[in-house]
């Protein structure tokens, strides 16, 4: 969700793994906030009042001063999650020259620079950089899941 503009006061991204929310403030003063994922898989693309009310209650737990903030808009979308809540950044061994960088789920854009750089290195050199080795596609078949679910912060 996005609020109306307020004088900038929040100079950091705030993430709560307990409340499954994150928020930051833009240079224009809007609060941009995100929430957890639905507890059941579906392909709905509509925001709901219930989702907004739940999210607002969690934001107020952290920042009671925001009780009169006006919401300008909210949105919904698909969240591409993997079983371990971590992305897949990998060459697919069975298909020569096929690479995947997806399944980011709730990580959003936070890791885009490092992900893009390492994916480019992998494609150019045809070798997986050490930094992204844990995110190989084959980790699921090998039962070597990435143990960083908390980093997603807004998982179920």
Each predicted region: which residue ranges?
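C-terminal catalytic lobe of FAD-dependent flavoproteins
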Residues: 18, 60-156
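Active-site lid/adjacent beta-loop-alpha segment flanking the redox-cofactor pocket in flavoenzymes
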Residues: 5-97
